[in-house]
Amino acid sequence: MDSIAVIGAGQMGNGIAQVAACAGYNVVMVDIKQEYVNKGIATIERSLGKLVAKERMTQLDADAARARISTSIDRHDCSSVDLVVEAVPEILDLKASIFSELDKICKPECILASNTSSISISKIADSTNRPDRVIGMHFMNPVPIMKLVEIINGDQTSEATNSAVVAAAEKMGKTALSCNDSPGFISNRILCPMLNEAILTLQEGVAEPVAIDGIMKLGMNHPIGPLALSDLIGLDTVLHIMNVLHEGLNDDKYAPAELLKTMVAEGKLGRKSGEGFYKY
């Protein structure tokens, strides 16, 4: 595997493009508007600059990594790559449409991966004629720092596809751990109910955010409290994942907190909107 395309130049997409280029892959980062890819490239350049400043990589290596990244607003530029990693918003119809298009554009042996954090890989694969070569590659945010890639096998994902993607993730310096397709996979099936429970304790007046987060940080050795983490992830994303769990597992223990729904409706999404459980 020599070349990778990343669909989406946002926070996750540009992070994936960066770590792939730093690992020696030739990368094409694709989005629907030139301004989006320009913003993504600017983010990568800033990130590489910080790594050089911290002496975690040389200027020569940073320049080489940047040179391996090209950009495009045409998905047909993915036609010759070995692996595509999709990193667009968590909307099944959008992902299915992109995978259907990529299935027609990409060479038959190309692997199509999704960075989805909760959407069924098997459902995404149904939009293609290569379900054995469709897989989940759930990178964690921020991608250049976090060491895990959660690999999700769909119902028809082949062992060869899994092995190839695990090897690619490891080449990027990540630990790749695999699971089978299920709502929320492992990471968010366990994490998001905890975040939701923290929101419920706030909703019920049990404690204020500083106390809730402080108890989990100091008492449970969490590096960040659940409410601050919810703000970092985005409250709209947390709500989406809770809805996926609630509907997919058909269990009311996954019902999202009313406070979470209210805050999302009010546009209080966390860091990205400037206000969530904290102000930024």
Place the predicted regions along the sequence by residue:
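Rossmann-like NAD(P)-binding element
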Residues: Y36, K50-I111, I119
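Structural motif
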Residues: I7, V30, S72, A87, ...
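Rossmann-fold dinucleotide-binding core
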Residues: I111-N180, N188-R189
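NAD(P)-dependent Rossmann-like dehydrogenase/reductase catalytic/cofactor-binding core
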Residues: D2, A23-Y25, E159, S163, ...
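Amphipathic alpha-helical segments at domain termini/boundaries
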Residues: A21, M29, A65-L83, A167-G173, ...
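Acidic/polar active-site rim loop that often engages polyanionic ligands
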Residues: Y25, S79, P142-I152, P223-I224, ...
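NAD(P)+-binding Rossmann beta1-loop-alpha1 motif at the extreme N-terminus of oxidoreductases
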Residues: M1-K50, K54
